[in-house]
Structures are given as structure tokens and as C-alpha cells.
Amino acid sequence: MMNCYVTYGTYDYLSKLKEEHDEESVMLFTNSDGAALYHETNSNSFFKNAKKYEVMDKKGDVTHPGFVVLNHIPVEESERAVFEDRFKNRAGKVESEPGCEGIRILRPISNDPYIVATFWDEEKSFKNWQTSEAYETAHKNRHTSKGLPKTIFSGKPYLKTYQVEN
């Protein structure tokens, strides 16, 4: 199974680290709060301190600049199977939306939130998707008896958005 590692820090430090490992599949994410390095590999990462995930689902090859949305979803340890089953059986419509270049469903190795990462050609494409019929369909069961029960969550989900640098 493919692994994914994410580490956070300053832009200067992480861009230098990325340059030192340009043979690796690494992406630099930036926003007004700082930066993150994202590393997908079938082996261990060169990061000294990173959050480790298993890639449960991967669609699209993302290797160029754009926009990424990281949806952090805290899930109770005892409810992980329920959560994962829901994502394994998802409709998979976001991948066919204009501007969507890929998606990753990331299972945390430690007690961190799951991450659903969607990669876009630009922020505008993500915003367009949020107001689309496909978005409504994908989220139609939220807050209903057909949706995931609130008890599976160990905290409130949150989004982080970044520009993806070259």
C-alpha cells in the first residue's frame, strides 16, 4: 500500500528540503499560515517529523501547480471501519468535475484525523464545484439519518486550503 507523509513548517525551510530531494514525489503546499510538504511513496519518507498516512484511495496523478483542499475528518478509533466503508462506497463524482485533477483518501497511522485531499487546477474550480449539483448530490445525506452518525466523529471536521507550488 502506498504511504503519504505530511510535514509542516516555514516556506523557506520546506522549499529547501524539497529541492534537496527533487528525485522524490513531493509537493510543496503554501498558504498565509505557512507551508506543508506532501510526500507519496511506497517506502519510508525522508522527513524527520511527519504525519504518516496510508493512501486508501487514489485517483489522478498530480504533479504540477494548482490548488489543494485538505478536509481533515477526526474519527473515533472504534468507528474507523464504518467511516472507511462509507468512503470505499462513495459515488466518486468529484473526480469528473471540471478542474478536479485528483483525490486522495488518507488513513492516519496514529490518532490523527483522516484527510480527504482534492487537487484542482485552480481555486475557482473548487469554488465552482461547491456550488454545483454534483456537490449537492455528494453531500445530500449530510445531517440526515442516511448520513454518517455524528457519534463516529471525535471532533469537528475542518478544511485547509493551499496553493500547490511547482
Predicted features by range, described:
Residues 61-66, 79, 115, 155-166:
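Short, low-order "capping/linker" segments at domain edges
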Residues 104-106, 160:
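General small-molecule cofactor/ligand-binding pocket signal
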Residues 2-8, 30-42, 68-73, 106-132:
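Short, well-ordered beta-strand segments in beta-rich or mixed alpha/beta enzyme
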Residues 75-77, 122, 163:
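Non-catalytic surface loops within mature trypsin-like serine protease
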Residues 10-21, 78-102:
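Short amphipathic alpha-helical segments
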Residues 46-84:
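Surface-exposed beta-loop interaction hotspot
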Residues 14-34, 41-54, 95-98, 123-155:
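An amphipathic, aromatic/His-enriched active-site/gating alpha helix that lines ligand/cofactor pockets
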